[in-house]
Amino acid sequence: MYLVVCWGRVTGNMISTRHCFSRCKSRSVRVIKATAMLFVAAMLFLALHMNFSHEASQQNLHRAAPISSPTTISRSTVQIRNATHDFLPASSTPMKDELIETESEFVDGFQRNEVIACSDTSEEFRTDSKRITLVNSQSGVPCPIRPPALAGRFVPSKKSSTYHELAAMFPDVQDGGHYTPRMCTPAEKTAIIIPYRNRCRHLYTLLPNLIPMLMRQNVDFTIFVIEQTTPETFNKGILFNAGYLEALKVDNYDCFILHDVDMIPIDDRNMYRCNKMGPVHFSPGVNKFKYKLFYSGLFGGVVGFTREQFRLINGASNLYFGWGGEDDDLRNRAVHMKLPLLRKTLAHGLYDMVSHVEAGWNVNPHSKGAHSLYDMLNKALGVQAGWNVHPNSKWPLRLFDSVNHAPAEGAGWNVNPDRFKIYSTSRQRQHVDGINSLVYNVTWYRTSPLYTWVGVGFNKTVITNSIPEDLRIGPEADNTYLTGNFTIIS
């Protein structure tokens, strides 16, 4: 019932009741609909913990220039390194040298901006084509399996330190981010590979927690920050492979720890050592999942391979542009080569994830707010345990695919909508997709007292075309990635 009185604005006469009610009802419906839409939108943003970027001021520092087309590219482009080495499998087919379509102006500009953003001064870095010289331990005493200096579980610092604070904090870390214990000789040399783009705050939150933990563990380590410098969608697998190859140009490392920049360890009994039996998953328990294993096949966050293991599986896939699928594909590669999967116990393999407050409106489908949404769905449906909506199931992720239309971190860290189809061809393309097919160039190589910083450029078309077309993507999605058989180790 609409109890309204409408008056003519021109004649001053009363408008017909029917016309009045019709017009007022139409306006009321529009107002109600608009209000409802605003309410739903507000609730959705609240539930999913969407965040505005407080780092938007840095976004311009990392804004990439468009890649020139093949018709306009000049011969001043950077010549690609041949990524094929003598330690690759005998079945590997060497790739010819390629030209990466990266304008030198873009490379130089990106290089300067990154140094300013993450060190405040370019004087702290030096460019050295001869690489770093490692100084190893002179002690003949083997390091103990369980060092006495371990503190156990600790409360990590969530403060993002400055470059100068970190450099002063760790004077024993040598140029290039290398450290070796003085009182004993470690059993292996370890390369920490950190894939990176536009995550200064995360990097400088990770390092003040990671470095002292590695020191207490008597790890002989070198930290490599591998940054994607081209404006392609972020590809973590390519950075893993490039980091592996570039690290081997520094030293013949025994162990490679592939470490997400936002994963902060909180227990130093989680020893950063590789295992000759098989690859190790170091991070089963993360705070956003209440320190419980998210799903049985989880292989993301922090993982470790020996040099031979990573070579045997042909490294990581180069085809996953965007979020999702690359870690599960990496796990499958080990399974295909009959390597047993090892996982640290939940008593020690614990991590806190740095809050993702990035530029753009992207939603992390595994955020706390997202899990609250799944909980509400499950309660509302009143279904049995076997019918619950899994946070990693296919249809909820489509919701995030549609929401994540804006680029994350100003660089395109979006959900990959084809990740399950790419995953379906994992076994068939493993021998042709990886370190033996990687085409990339080193846009810069810089060392500092904290890390070795390597800029990596690549072209998506060149990367994709290096794989046979029938092996790049399958016709149907494969959702079997949720399962995995692991042996728990301490």
From Swiss-Prot:
Principal subcellular localization: Golgi
Cytoplasmic side: 1-30
Any matching Pfam family: Glyco_transf_7C
Membrane topology: Single-pass type II membrane protein
Lumenal topological segments: 51-490
Pathway where it operates: Protein modification; protein glycosylation
Reactions the enzyme catalyzes: an N-acetyl-beta-D-glucosaminyl derivative + UDP-N-acetyl-alpha-D-glucosamine = an N-acetyl-beta-D-glucosaminyl-(1->4)-N-acetyl-beta-D-glucosaminyl derivative + UDP + H(+)
Biological processes, Gene Ontology terms: carbohydrate metabolic process; protein glycosylation
Signal peptide: none
Glycosylation, residue list: N51, N82, N441, N459, N485
InterPro entries, per database record: Galactosyl_T (IPR003859), Galactosyl_T_C (IPR027791), Galactosyl_T_N (IPR027995), Nucleotide-diphossugar_trans (IPR029044)
Spans through the membrane: 31-50
Superkingdom as given in the UniProt entry: Eukaryota
Top-tier EC class: transferase
Subcellular localization(s) per the UniProt record: Golgi apparatus membrane
Assigned EC number: 2.4.1.-
Keyword annotations of the record: Glycoprotein, Glycosyltransferase, Golgi apparatus, Membrane, Signal-anchor, Transferase, Transmembrane, Transmembrane helix
Family: Belongs to the glycosyltransferase 7 family.
Name of the protein described by the UniProt record: Beta-N-acetyl-D-glucosaminide beta-1,4-N-acetylglucosaminyl-transferase
Protein species of origin: Lymnaea stagnalis
